Regions:
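Sec-dependent bacterial lipoprotein signal peptides
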Residues: 1-25
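Tryptophan-paired
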Residues: 64-113, 227-327, 384
């Protein structure tokens, strides 16, 4: 019976300790979702890292953010934070130097991006997932087709200093929260006075998009004889290193199956139904590391199906020199209407499309239901 009473007493003590920890750390994020993470431990100092999303909100409004923190003398992360509070994160750190980065959302909310090596500040990276194409085959055995990435904004801070003085002041502030008798005893031991509560601030970090858009225009003549189009942009960056916000060395191909049609105008301002351009927009991590800016560094492959449902035309366009400055764009350059400026490529089909007979004797024209040609082709006609 005595042993049972001792066990019961021990359980009561243990439960009280757990409840006190939870009550003192009610905002601690156990990865169950977004919460403001705020905890205190003696011998640490609070550091508030401010975050400014103004350079990204016109692309997407984040609903939360994630931050990873490392000590300077270790490659292993010491903390991970997830928060609906987009304005700042509060870190409670031991004396030393620290690195951190933030990005919008959480890793699991992305469907086209996967994160790797997040335990290592210098090696952490984001990559597009591999997808299967119903019509495009890669040219090299180790190359792959990548999904178009969702919006991802990042910023980093290095060498956050937590000094001995900062820790001492924070420790004194902690003592000020103790009961009067215990507090006075501690102050007498330290021969110090109760301090004024302070907050050490860093930043703001200003996350910007590491995803770029590329607008591709394919100019054509004899547009009524075109039924559908497919495109592939080859040798783009597979991902980026998060801490340096620089592209990785690996390559992927992105396919384009959705196009808008933009007709030319005639001299009197009318619509020229025979001439125009197909416009496709590609989202990408940009150009891979080691890009030299030579034409053959990147290729745009276009495949056209004509209205006879038999004639297929193919064309390669070397564009490595044309898009050599793609990585300089991050969505912060805005036009007079406040919309982001992205680079454009204008490519011209070398000759007018052949005047073939429409299948079934119809009138021809664009058709998104193209059967075996592809399951994911869409051409949007403008309203005239």
């Amino acid at each position: 019976m005595r042993r049972c009473r001792n066990i019961a007493a021990s359980l009561v003590v243990l439960l009280s300790i757990i409840l006190s920890v939870v009550s003192c750390n009610k905002d601690l994020d156990f990865d169950f979702g977004f919460k403001d993470l705020c905890f205190y431990h003696p011998h640490t100092a609070p550091v508030q890292v401010n975050v400014d999303w103004s350079k990204f909100r016109h692309l997407e409004t984040p609903s939360g953010m994630t931050s990873y923190v490392w000590a300077d003398n270790s490659e292993q992360k010491i903390a991970k934070f997830r928060s609906h509070n987009l304005n700042y994160i509060t870190l409670n750190l031991l004396e030393g130097y620290y690195h951190a980065f933030v990005f919008n959302q959480t890793e699991t909310e992305y469907t086209t991006i996967e994160f790797y090596n997040l335990d290592n500040f210098n090696k952490a990276e984001a990559r597009v997932i591999e997808v299967k194409s119903s019509w495009y085959s890669t040219k090299l055995p180790d190359s792959k087709v990548g999904a178009e990435p969702e919006w991802l904004a990042i910023d980093c801070v290095q060498n956050i200093e937590v000094s001995e003085e900062m820790v001492a002041k924070a420790e004194a502030e902690y003592l000020a929260t103790l009961p009067e008798a215990q507090r006075q005893q501690k102050y007498n031991e330290k021969n110090t006075k109760a301090p004024t509560k302070t907050q050490n601030e860093v930043g703001p970090l200003v996350p910007t998009s590491i995803i770029k858009n590329l607008d591709i225009y394919i100019h054509l003549e004899n547009l009524p004889y075109l039924r559908s189009a497919l495109g592939a942009v080859e040798d783009m960056a597979e991902g980026c290193y998060i801490s340096s916000m620089s592209p990785t060395e690996n390559h992927v191909t992105h396919t384009i199956g959705s196009w808008d049609v933009i007709y030319d105008t005639t001299e009197n301002g009318g619509v020229d139904m025979m001439k125009g351009a197909l416009k496709g927009t590609l989202s990408t991590f940009g150009l891979p590391a080691g890009h030299s800016g030579k034409p053959d560094d990147n290729n745009i492959y276009i495949k056209l199906l004509l209205v006879d449902n038999q004639t297929i035309l193919e064309q390669d366009f070397p564009v490595g020199d044309i898009i050599a400055d793609l990585n300089e764009y991050n969505g912060t350059q805005l036009d007079e209407n406040g919309k982001p400026i992205w680079p454009e490529i204008h490519l011209y089909w070398p000759e007018p499309l052949p005047e073939v007979e429409p299948v079934g004797g119809g009138t021809g024209g664009f058709d998104v239901g193209v059967g075996d040609w592809s399951d994911d082709v869409e051409i949007i006609l403008p309203l005239l």
